[in-house]
């Protein structure tokens, strides 16, 4: 009988190859740095220390790897067209899924990756869509007594997510993705991002690698990740993510929360001690539970795992073997 194997511990049985950040940086080869300091500063999220050195160390090698995957998919597409004796037709978008906990740096990573990929010599059209817009509106969550479960799998309109990704993969034009406001903490009614036949789509969200229970009647149930050509999980020790979440909350209290239109404006009026207590409660009762129950278990499903250290920078890379 097989013993349980920890797939994320380096061993002969692990499906991953593991690299330090320094080893990974060497795979950049001659990939050019096409971003400036000011652009990285604009793209990074509040409190994220990523700089050009981190882009050189991690992102340029990642860009080169993804270029190889995209080129391989295009070659396979052409060979399949030839095999089927088909006329030249539209190549479906290459979809990259980006997953990980809140406060771990998914949004920064996705935005920087989008800019790097769009600057390849082939100048592909790259779009970025987040799953936030696919959350049920707050009114629906309140009606179903799920506001404290916001961010958990059941708070998303998975049917809408699957219809969106199906339309993208079907090569449909002007596909609509609902927009979300972090200021109002709600879906923006009637507002959409238009995704029009990109070459590459980056789809970012905490639960994009989630699987669901199969129905007893044997009907096919597609998972979001079924539509991905490549998937990335941003990882870190939960104790570090906890610290980053609290630090971010306290910074937002001094910035975005001060806007009277902010859903969290009331927290800006609290003392520092009271605000920190609120943040701790949100972490313990919502975000930590979601991480342990729904997000962390999806980590072994990723093609690439980027693990961060205490300085919020990548210190280890795990790449799935092929």
Curated annotation (Swiss-Prot):
Biological pathway: Cofactor biosynthesis; coenzyme A biosynthesis; CoA from (R)-pantothenate: step 1/5
Entries under Pfam families matching the protein: PRK (PF00485)
Domain of life of the source: Bacteria
The reaction(s) this protein catalyses: (R)-pantothenate + ATP = (R)-4'-phosphopantothenate + ADP + H(+)
GO molecular function: ATP binding; pantothenate kinase activity
Disulfide cysteine pairs (residue numbers): none
Keyword ATP-binding: yes
Enzyme class name: transferase
Subcellular locations according to the entry: Cytoplasm
GO CC annotation: cytoplasm
EC number: 2.7.1.33
Binding site for ATP: 100-107
Primary site of residence: cytoplasm
GO biological process, one term: coenzyme A biosynthetic process
Keyword annotations from UniProtKB, A to Z: ATP-binding, Coenzyme A biosynthesis, Cytoplasm, Kinase, Nucleotide-binding, Transferase
Similarity annotation: Belongs to the prokaryotic pantothenate kinase family.
Family matches, as NCBIfam families: panK_bact (TIGR00554)
Name of this protein: Pantothenate kinase
């Amino acid at each position: 009988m097989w013993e349980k194997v920890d797939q994320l511990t380096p061993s002969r049985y692990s499906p991953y190859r593991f690299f330090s950040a320094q080893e990974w940086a060497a795979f950049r080869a001659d990939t050019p740095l096409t971003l400036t300091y000011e652009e990285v500063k604009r793209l990074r999220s509040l409190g994220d220390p990523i700089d050009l050195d981190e882009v050189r160390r991690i992102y340029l090698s990642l860009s080169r790897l993804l270029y190889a995957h995209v080129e391989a998919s295009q070659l396979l597409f052409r060979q399949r067209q030839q095999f089927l004796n088909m006329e030249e037709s539209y190549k479906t978008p290459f979809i990259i899924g980006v997953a990980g906990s809140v406060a771990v740096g998914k949004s920064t990573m996705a935005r920087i990756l989008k800019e790097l990929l769009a600057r390849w010599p082939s100048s592909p059209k790259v779009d970025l869509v987040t799953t936030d817009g696919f959350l049920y509106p707050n009114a629906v969550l309140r009606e179903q007594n799920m506001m404290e479960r916001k961010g958990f799998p059941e708070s998303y309109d998975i049917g809408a997510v699957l219809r969106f990704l199906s339309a993208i993969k079907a090569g449909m034009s002007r596909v609509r993705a609902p927009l979300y406001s972090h200021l109002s903490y709600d879906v923006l009614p009637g507002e959409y991002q238009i995704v029009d036949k990109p070459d590459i789509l980056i789809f970012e969200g905490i639960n994009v690698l989630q699987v669901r229970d199969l129905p007893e009647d044997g009907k096919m149930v597609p998972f979001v990740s079924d539509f991905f050509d490549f998937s990335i999980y941003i990882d870190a020790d939960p104790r570090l993510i906890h610290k980053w979440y609290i630090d971010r909350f306290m910074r937002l209290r001094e910035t975005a929360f001060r806007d009277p239109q902010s859903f969290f404006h009331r927290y800006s009026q609290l003392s520092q001690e009271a605000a920190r207590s609120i943040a701790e409660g949100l972490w313990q009762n919502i975000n930590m539970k979601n991480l342990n129950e729904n997000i962390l278990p999806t980590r072994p499903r990723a093609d690439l795992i980027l693990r961060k250290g205490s300085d919020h920078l990548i210190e280890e890379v795990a790449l799935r073997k092929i």
